[in-house]
Amino acid sequence: MEKEIIITTTETVPQREVAEILGVVFGNTVRAKHVGKDILAGLKNIVGGEIEEYTEMLRDARMEALNRMIKEAKKLGADAVVNVRFTTSQTMAGAAELLAYGTAVRLR
């Protein structure tokens, strides 16, 4: 059974002490828009409301980036990743990168 690690946006883990900082870990994914979904999204943009196709795409991208970051932390033998953050950037027309990063640590 694979060990679960703690993922938190805070700098500390309650009731635990950082024994060792292992370094920055990250996971990323680049996603492109589907032409058909882009047309539907454009129509929704005219009338207003949530663009569900993009919401779903970004949710999936966040999870993929987070899972890749966790995989890197496990390779280092981390017990936790603290100070986790997400960022996005446009890599080219119609495509965006989602990056998850944090500090891998061992806990006492």
Curated annotation (Swiss-Prot):
Query: Which Cys pairs does UniProt list as disulfide-bonded?
Result: none
Report which superkingdom the organism of origin falls in: Archaea
Family matches, as SUPFAM superfamilies: YbjQ-like (SSF117782)
Pfam families attached to this UniProt entry: YbjQ_1 (PF01906)
PANTHER family xref list: UPF0145 PROTEIN SCO3412, UPF0145 PROTEIN YBJQ
What is the similarity comment for this entry? Belongs to the UPF0145 family.
- Supply the HAMAP family for this chain: UPF0145
Its recorded name reads UPF0145 protein AF_0869
